[in-house]
């Protein structure tokens, strides 16, 4: 039976305050249920109503045409995302409202009002046009977390160019692969970026990448660090010089709803990166609405999502979602612990952040650094917290709730993917009770199903399987850029006719979904299928443990043995006695079947630059492989892998 066993029990339930509930957009479980049923029964009526809150140059003739894997949304409708994110607000009192509040790692501040941003975006749209960029051309953006990244994205959408943002932490090789795949005409980069007090050599990486990626005709360089950088006359241009010469009026291109908006690459475990393609109308409508309801956005909110624009979270919930809602969005350039581990909390207090959205990996780091750091700050402006990027273990959830939210801020634990475009499963903060470790319920219009290996629905509560989506939703990816076969093979071949997320999940008796991690992060131990996330959660619940990553290694008797890589909190030291204590602890929390066969202490875990643990590398290390295979372009610190190999 291809079913995931779920073994970690977390029974506590938390409710939003009456005061929060009264003010929320969706105020009760009953209201959620009524709207959800309508969104499933009449998706065209529901999404047509939502899309009507935005501006369309020409109305659609049909809201939804066709079905998975190739639905079309808002057919015949014409709109422009930058118009909806900027022009719509500039015509109202929001004209002089802060759109982007930015802080650089060294401490500089910039505030761009909606009017400022509108003018800058139009200027840069004209710059792109003068460089020969036309509708449908691809533009690669390789920048630090600075306002110019958002300006460049919005300028592309204004003229119908397709942007491909590449995370500034990626290597020259990873950048070259992504430029070549998209056949980008223009590259936008900076002389460098600041990270932990050092300088990231973006221009140097760009020059290296362009030796291999020859489609690029022009490189626009933002002066960020003032470093001397190599220069290719005729090809390279300073951002500020081009902007000085550009007019600040550029009419938005009228875009068909299904025309391409952006490509964003996700790393496959092997082979070349996948270029996920999102289109204009459906993506715009869905991120607008999810941002509004999941974060319960109000006009007075100061909203901060800590993601980098190089990831989908940065696209949907740093730039597009907040600006479509006329919100104030905070951008921060640097590391959470630079110069000290309270940098995030300083920013929260300084700007009066009300809604805060970050990753579980960051929360576990905050736990490791101790309560003293957030304890130095008031944090009383916060009213709502969120998590994104991976399942959050109950221990980290409870710490976040009590230490950062002071027990008064609801937490939205959001499940979604690059491919889904927007949040798919979550609690709505005024409507739902929260269960630590459970993402929550499907967002409007989202119809999940948990299937076993034989494509049968898993009916029993708390029995796991593959998380699939059975109906189209507006912001889903439309294809893999240049590779339609890979699109079908990757997402629609495992369970015919439905979208397969690659994640395992279970649904409890109340309809709450718990995400069990990637299906390929499932262990088969003596015929039992165990989700790695549950064993990791049990380990992290031990007071000595800061972080844990669990993988399987081949075992002649059990099929797979359980290997746990563990980092300890400050004040705890590795010992054989602690190893035994941790093994016994897991056996007690989950059951003897989940007792790790081996525990390896380490000072750090190998992570991608977005903070996800690279379990694939840990599997290779656990199996004793001397050479690390597969794509490691997203690995943040290679020395971690070397130290783990030496300690093997």
UniProtKB/Swiss-Prot annotation:
Disulfide bonds: none annotated. ATP binds at residues 389-391, 413-418, 503, 518, 529. Its cofactor is Mg(2+). InterPro entries: Ac_CoA_lig (IPR011904), ACAS_N (IPR032387), AMP-bd_C (IPR025110), AMP-bd_C_sf (IPR045851), AMP-binding_CS (IPR020845), AMP-dep_synth/lig_dom (IPR000873), ANL_N_sf (IPR042099). Gene3D superfamilies: 3.30.300.30, N-terminal domain of ligase-like. GO terms for cellular component: cytosol. It comes from the Bacteria. Keywords: Acetylation, ATP-binding, Ligase, Magnesium, Metal-binding, Nucleotide-binding. GO terms for biological process: acetyl-CoA biosynthetic process from acetate. SUPFAM superfamilies: Acetyl-CoA synthetase-like. The keyword GTP-binding does not apply. GO terms for molecular function: acetate-CoA ligase activity; AMP binding; ATP binding; metal ion binding. It catalyses: acetate + ATP + CoA = acetyl-CoA + AMP + diphosphate. CoA binds at residues 195-198, 313, 337. NCBIfam families: Ac_CoA_lig_AcsA (TIGR02188), PRK00174.1 (NF001208). Catalyzes the conversion of acetate into acetyl-CoA (AcCoA), an essential intermediate at the junction of anabolic and catabolic pathways. AcsA undergoes a two-step reaction. In the first half reaction, AcsA combines acetate with ATP to form acetyl-adenylate (AcAMP) intermediate. In the second half reaction, it can then transfer the acetyl group from AcAMP to the sulfhydryl group of CoA, forming the product AcCoA. Belongs to the ATP-dependent AMP-binding enzyme family. PANTHER family: ACETYL-COENZYME A SYNTHETASE, ACETYL-COENZYME A SYNTHETASE 1. This is Acetyl-coenzyme A synthetase. The lineage of its organism: Bacteria, Thermotogati, Deinococcota, Deinococci, Thermales. The gene is acsA.
């Amino acid at each position: 039976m291809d079913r995931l066993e779920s073994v970690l029990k977390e029974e506590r339930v938390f409710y939003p305050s009456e005061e929060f509930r009264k003010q929320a957009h969706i105020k009760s479980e009953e209201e959620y249920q009524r709207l959800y049923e309508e969104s499933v029964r009449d998706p065209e009526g529901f999404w047509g109503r939502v899309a009507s809150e935005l501006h369309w140059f020409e109305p659609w003739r049909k809201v939804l045409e066709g079905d998975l894997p190739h639905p079309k949304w808002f057919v015949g409708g014409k709109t422009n995302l930058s118009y909806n994110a900027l022009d719509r607000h500039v015509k109202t009192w929001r004209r002089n409202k802060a759109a982007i509040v930015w802080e650089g790692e060294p401490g500089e501040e910039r505030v761009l009002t909606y009017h400022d941003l509108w003018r800058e975006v139009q200027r840069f749209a004209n710059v792109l046009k003068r460089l020969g960029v036309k509708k449908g051309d691809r533009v690669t953006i390789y920048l630090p977390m600075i306002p110019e990244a958002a300006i460049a994205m919005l300028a592309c959408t204004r003229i119908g160019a397709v942007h491909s943002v590449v995370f500034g932490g990626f290597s020259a090789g990873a950048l070259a692969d992504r430029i070549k795949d998209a056949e980008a005409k223009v590259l936008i980069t900076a002389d460098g970026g600041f990270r932990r007090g050092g300088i990231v050599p973006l221009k140097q990486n760009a020059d290296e990448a362009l030796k291999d990626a020859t489609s690029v005709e022009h490189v626009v360089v933002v002066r960020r660090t003032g470093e001397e950088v190599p220069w290719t006359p005729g090809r390279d241009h300073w951002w500020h010089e081009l902007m000085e010469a550009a007019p600040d009026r550029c009419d938005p291109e009228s875009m068909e709803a299904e025309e391409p908006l952006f490509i964003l690459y996700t790393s496959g475990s092997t082979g070349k990166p996948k270029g996920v393609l999102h289109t204009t109308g459906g993506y715009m409508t869905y991120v607008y609405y999810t941002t509004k309801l999941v974060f319960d956005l109000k006009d007075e909110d100061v909203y901060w999502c800590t993601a980098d624009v190089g990831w989908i979270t940065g696209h949907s919930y740093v730039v597009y979602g907040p600006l479509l809602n006329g919100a104030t969005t905070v951008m921060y350039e640097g590391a959470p612990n630079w110069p000290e581990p309270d940098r995030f909390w300083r920013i929260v207090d300084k700007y009066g952040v009300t809604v805060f959205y970050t990753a579980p990996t960051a929360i576990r780091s905050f736990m490791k650094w101790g309560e003293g750091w957030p304890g130095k700050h008031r944090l009383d402006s916060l009213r709502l917290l969120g998590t994104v990027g991976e399942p959050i273990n109950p221990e980290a959830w409870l710490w976040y709730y009590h230490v950062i939210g002071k027990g008064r801020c609801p937490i939205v634990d959001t499940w979604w993917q690059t491919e889904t475009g927007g949040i798919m499963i979550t609690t709505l903060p005024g409507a739902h009770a929260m269960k630590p470790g459970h993402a929550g319920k499907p967002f409007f219009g989202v119809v999940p199903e948990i299937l076993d290996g034989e494509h049968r629905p898993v009916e029993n509560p708390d029995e796991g399987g593959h998380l699939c989506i059975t109906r189209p939703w507006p912001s889903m990816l439309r294809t893999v850029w240049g590779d339609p076969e890979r699109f079908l093979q990757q997402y629609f071949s495992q369970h015919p006719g439905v979208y397969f997320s690659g994640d395992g999940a279970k649904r409890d008796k109340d309809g709450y979904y718990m995400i069990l991690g990637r299906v390929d992060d499932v262990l088969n131990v003596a015929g039992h299928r165990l989700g790695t996330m549950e064993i990791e959660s049990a380990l992290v619940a031990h007071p000595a443990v800061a972080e844990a990553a669990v993988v399987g290694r081949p075992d002649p008797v059990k099929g797979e043995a359980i290997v746990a890589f563990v980092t300890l909190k400050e004040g705890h030291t590795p010992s054989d006695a602690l190893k035994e204590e941790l093994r016994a602890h897991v056996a007690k929390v989950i059951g003897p079947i989940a007792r790790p066969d081996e525990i390896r202490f380490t000072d750090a875990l190998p992570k991608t630059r977005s903070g996800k643990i690279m379990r694939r590398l840990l599997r290779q290390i656990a199996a004793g492989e001397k050479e690390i295979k597969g794509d490691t372009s997203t690995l943040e610190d290679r020395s971690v892998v070397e130290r783990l190999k030496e300690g093997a």
